[in-house]
């Protein structure tokens, strides 16, 4: 009976192993994309970018027409208790921002139930523009808005990639720290229980407290690690270490001199200078001028005309003076912002490079420290094998080597994070 039960259990176990779907660990791309999708600032930046691109396309792609349908109060589509009676629907094909003008083609479609007719009204072609236009400045402002929106998206992506890389490397480091110190604590406590020498006991107690502190620090740090990293740490760590060469390839000795933010300010400055040249415009009336051609279908004649529309405040409360003053001042303001942005870019790169130099020196020092610890551990191992030293001295030497090795790993991780941060200035990274 027991044999039958055992065979059944083995069969069920095999069945479960075959038919239980395997769950593959999520990699960098999966977690990174998931985090971006859950970031309100990133999603908002993407939306702002689409808005800015659409506004800019109004100038850059003026050749793309818009098609609209409209009615007026006098030509509304009328439907009553007797059904449809009459109405005029006017399709309009418009090209906007053609050298500051709008070109529109209209062909009214008229319907009447009383006469039972459906036909076209007189087609017309019109060209409308303001008397004074600033199309170039408007386009530069729209282009600046695109660059600014692109910068916001890029900054959100940069912050997310650096945060994820930091989470992964910290999780790996603190995981190793916790594992090593748990192992060290068990050995230290075992040796402590067998030690009689008072001075040695004091040193062991100190080491035990240090191990407990390291365990507490690592435990608290790992408690802050999110599940998306914690559950996939091995795959994520492998991805980060595998992609670091790709991410840091663009880094060279020549510091970047521009960025999306700087491009945006350069466009804004050029637009502001153009508006400054026409700072008198707020004081001038700016009528809309329309030139039109229409074809009279009944008379088979071509008619033309010009029209002007105007709205002008002869007396205001200072709005025009303020607008003119802004046109005078904005070039200087934007120029100062541009200078500051260039300085911030250079300073940002310089500070990261300085941090990298310090970390590289730390790593060289740590290499020497590890070499010393390894030599000491090897010596203690030989002395312990020969019975010349106590077990506690041997154990402490081995623990010192393990601790220094982990400290070296932490410096390596810090160097990688600084390189990823620097690479983002060169347009590298995710």
Identify the function of each model-found stretch.
Residues 1-9, 26, 30, 135, ...:
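Periplasmic alpha-helical coiled-coil/stalk elements that build and connect Gram-negative outer-membrane
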Residues 9-18:
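Bacterial N-terminal signal peptides
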Residues 23-90, 143, 197-201, 205, ...:
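Bacterial Sec-pathway N-terminal export signals of envelope proteins
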Residues 36-41, 53-66, 91-119, 124-141, ...:
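A glycine-/polar-enriched beta->alpha junction
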Residues 73-77, 109-113, 131, 293-299, ...:
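Transmembrane beta-strands of outer-membrane beta-barrel pores
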Residues 83-89, 117-123, 300-306:
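Residues that define the transmembrane beta-barrel architecture of outer-membrane proteins
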Residues 323-329, 333-368:
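C-terminal structural cap/anchor segments
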